Amino acid sequence: METKQFKAESKRLLEMMIHSIYTHKEIFLRELISNASDAMDKIYYKALTDETITFDKDAYKITIEPNKETRQLILRDTGIGMTKDELEENLGTIAKSGSLAFKAENESKDGHDIIGQFGVGFYSAFMVADTVTVVTKPFGSDVAYKWESHGVDGYTIEEVEKEMVGTDITLHIKANEEDENYDEYLEPYRLRSIIKKYSDFIRYPIEMEETEQRPVEGSDETESVTVMKTVNSMVPIWRKNKRELTDEDYRNFYQEKRYGFDAPIKHIHISADGAVRYQSILFIPEQPSFDYYSKEFEKGLELYANGVLIMEKCSDLLPDHFSFVKGMVDSEDLSLNISREMLQHDRQLKLIAKNIQSKIKTQLEALLRDDREKYETFYQAFGRQLKFGIYNDYGMQKDTVKDLVLFHSAKEKKLVTLAEYVAAMPEEQKYIYYASGESTDRLDKLPQSELVKDKGFDILYFTEEIDEFAIQMLLNYDGKEFKSVTSSDLGIEQTEQAETTETQAEMFKAMQEVLAGHVKEVKASTRLKSHPVCFATDGAVSIEMEKILKAMPNNQDVAAVKILELNTSHDVFRAIETAYAEDRPKFERYTKLMYQQALLMEGLPIEDPVAFANEVCALMI
């Protein structure tokens, strides 16, 4: 027996690798299974170039054997095994990758590839085991070897007897600690769960013993029978031919992966073989998850490296405006042990993400074009996120999303795209008009919209907080600027202008003095037809934006620049004129009342509701 030290490594390095790369101890099993799969792939590679070797895939498998009494977990494979030199080279040096070295010598010949990085992944076993024993017999040799280590202090190698080619790894599971239950890695149900989670699509069968109850022949009684059962699915759906798959196959996969309790509206199956190779199945859900619009929600797709799950939610694969998309990505070009930090700078991952965004956009555009009813169902659930995509990152993605958003049309009484709105605009209409408020019913009654509607121009109703912010970031659509119906200048040429007498001009000035600090101006309205009063705004901040900004935490004192407009054809206006001429105190009361009525119509708070109520009652007596 030879006792050796690890080459150029220390306890600190081993601990640093374990804690920095692996945050969940359960992934040790994923690493060992991946290495076992690699070992069988190596025989496959040899069979491709050596006609004397026959590769019968059915003869290759991985076996998992937990033993609670001895606290041992054994993983057996029928792979290529390791020589003594390979044991020292691959297991004696942390971060040395036998698989990567083999891969460099054997470039992919027909699609098979090597997953693991043996020197890194193997050492994850020490997260759950205090002793690791490896017994291996290399392909084409009669000699077997035993490698054993208790950790960073070193390892021993000796010759042993082993009948079959392959490798047996025995983990001596640690005793439980106060904050760590290692017993779970000896529980068959827990091991199956880990296998299904991380290694379900390894191409070789992963077998475990399972006890079944079977009827005893010639009797009503049953007996317990132990049988070997394959735990993993082996062939992932994303590697199957799309033509062989049905909608039901995709729905079943959606349910199996627990992407949601609903049925997806659409699936997207991608098989890319260009600058970067990857397969992906994406789903557009019908309904958001319960936490989708909460701060706890995490976006991301499952990320696999050649069939092995390396990240449950890779956020870098999805832009925020498509964060509702569920699904997975599997790439042969990604490393199994790539860290989150490295992923953020990975060129291949960025190419995949860019391609995925393009595919999602194309499919949503097709859904909008070909199945409007289904798209609107989707939009009711996720339209807010699409509009957020216009606003987010200073509008960097606005061109990606602008043709996917819908708004309620006042004229059509239905949702329309911006393109549909512009296409229906009369020739003399200069702007895309919109109105912001809590509901379409409330906006239908908005006093400021009377002139725009009289001209036969459509109005888009903005009923979500994000709408106006998104449109301001968009600036225009197809060269047409957006304009609120509350804007002081609607950009509408009128044959009849509101004529103001000298006395009325003086009265407006007096009203402005009464409302000093509250409004910028008081003037005659050109937009009001049946209502007595309304607010117009001047500048970028609308009244709805003011309400939203003031409701935010740590809000700044942001307010819309308000203009009080009066309908000079209304009876109320004549009452104000009379009061101005005959009763100045009443005139001031009327002025404040008009201002407060305008506040109420906009849903803004009145500074003193009690005084307002008393004032209304006083005027009734």
From Swiss-Prot:
Gene3D superfamilies: 3.30.230.80, 3.40.50.11260, Heat shock protein 90, C-terminal domain, Histidine kinase-like ATPase, C-terminal domain. The keyword ATP-binding applies. It comes from the Bacteria. Residues 341-547 are annotated as: B. CDD domains: HATPase_Hsp90-like. One of its GO terms (cellular component) is cytoplasm. InterPro entries: HATPase_C_sf, Heat_shock_protein_90_CS, HSP90_C, Hsp90_fam, Hsp90_N, Ribosomal_Su5_D2-typ_SF. Signal peptide: none annotated. Pfam families: HATPase_c_3 (PF13589), HSP90 (PF00183). GO terms for molecular function: ATP binding; ATP hydrolysis activity; ATP-dependent protein folding chaperone; unfolded protein binding. Keywords: ATP-binding, Chaperone, Cytoplasm, Nucleotide-binding, Stress response. Residues 548-621 are annotated as: C. Residues 1-340 are annotated as: A. It is found in: Cytoplasm. Molecular chaperone. Has ATPase activity. Belongs to the heat shock protein 90 family. Homodimer. PANTHER family: HEAT SHOCK PROTEIN 90 FAMILY MEMBER. This is Chaperone protein HtpG. The lineage of its organism: Bacteria, Bacillati, Bacillota, Bacilli, Bacillales. The gene is htpG.
